[in-house]
């Protein structure tokens, strides 16, 4: 693909950014000894899932995810006696997805997954995120759900924090950048141990469920990041902001790798043309994704 088409592709990505942002993918690892079915499954709808391939509880987890309307799920089924999740994480490393959830996660596995997400984002520039229970990771890639004992119309018994992470992952994957998950109504909840100190918990990087007297809702849409730097300010603690950052990074990288590298001569003129394409992409993102009052620019580093 030549450079004129790259510009067209960037403009198209900009125009469709909001719509594409509502089509997130949830990866879910289920501990299940059911013999039927495969270890790796990709479903576009809960209607694609054969309930006989999973335990009744694991099937409820999938229903929780799909209540949030993700574009699809990547389901990895492992035995209940598995010693660690390293093989599954290696599989997921080569796939494209947005949010990871493991309803049967142990404390040791939580530590491993949190460290893996941090490494994937910080060292390998992946845009993976995970919804984990009671995980003070202090990182933008980890959403720390802390509300427990959640009674939902989607389950036969109350859900633990770890289990209800499935619902949150589905919500986050299905929301577009046109809105935040703050005060998103969770209409399936009929009871939950909501915190009395919600403001303090939110400031501590916790995603909490609140009750306004009539409805249960997500409190404020924050991730676990609480230590801020000049490079990673307080804005990076907002889930919606990070969704925009990740979408931007994926679009630039994917277009560069598929339409520039090996397709054109990497000389100064072509680099400038590619930068011009990025600037056109910026203009399409201003408003819902990029702050139109900010100088959103791109340039070649010649040093």
Go through each PLM region and give its residues.
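Structured, hydrophobic secondary-structure cores that serve as assembly/anchoring elements
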Residues: 1-61, 66, 179, 183, ...
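Acidic, serine/threonine- and glycine-rich low-complexity intrinsically disordered segments
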Residues: 184-195
């Amino acid at each position: 693909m030549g450079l004129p088409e790259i510009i067209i592709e960037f403009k198209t990505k900009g125009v469709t950014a909001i719509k594409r942002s509502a089509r997130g993918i949830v990866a879910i690892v289920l501990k299940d000894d059911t013999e039927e079915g495969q270890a790796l499954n990709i479903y576009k709808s809960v209607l694609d899932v054969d309930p006989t391939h999973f335990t009744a509880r694991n099937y409820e987890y999938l229903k929780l995810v799909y209540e949030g309307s993700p574009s699809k799920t990547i389901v990895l089924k492992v035995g209940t006696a598995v010693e660690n999740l390293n093989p599954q994480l290696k599989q997921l490393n080569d796939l494209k997805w947005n949010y990871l959830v493991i309803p049967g996660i142990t404390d040791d596995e939580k530590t491993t997954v949190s460290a893996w997400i941090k490494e994937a984002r910080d060292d390998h520039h992946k845009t993976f995120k995970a919804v984990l229970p009671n995980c003070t990771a202090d990182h933008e890639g980890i959403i720390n759900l802390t509300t427990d004992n959640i009674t939902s119309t989607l389950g036969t018994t109350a859900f633990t924090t770890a289990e209800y992470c499935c619902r949150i992952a589905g919500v986050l994957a299905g929301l577009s950048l046109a809105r935040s998950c703050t005060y998103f109504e969770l209409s399936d909840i009929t009871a939950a141990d909501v915190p009395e100190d919600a403001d303090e918990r939110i400031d501590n990087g916790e995603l909490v469920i609140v009750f306004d007297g009539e409805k249960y809702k997500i409190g404020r849409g924050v991730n676990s990041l609480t230590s801020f730097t000049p490079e990673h300010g307080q804005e990076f603690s907002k889930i919606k902001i990070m969704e925009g950052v990740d979408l931007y990074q994926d679009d630039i990288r994917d277009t560069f790798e598929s339409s520039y590298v090996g397709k054109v001569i990497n000389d100064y003129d072509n680099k400038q043309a590619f930068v011009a394409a990025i600037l056109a992409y910026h203009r399409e993102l201003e408003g819902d994704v990029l702050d139109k009052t900010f100088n959103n620019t791109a340039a070649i580093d010649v040093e």
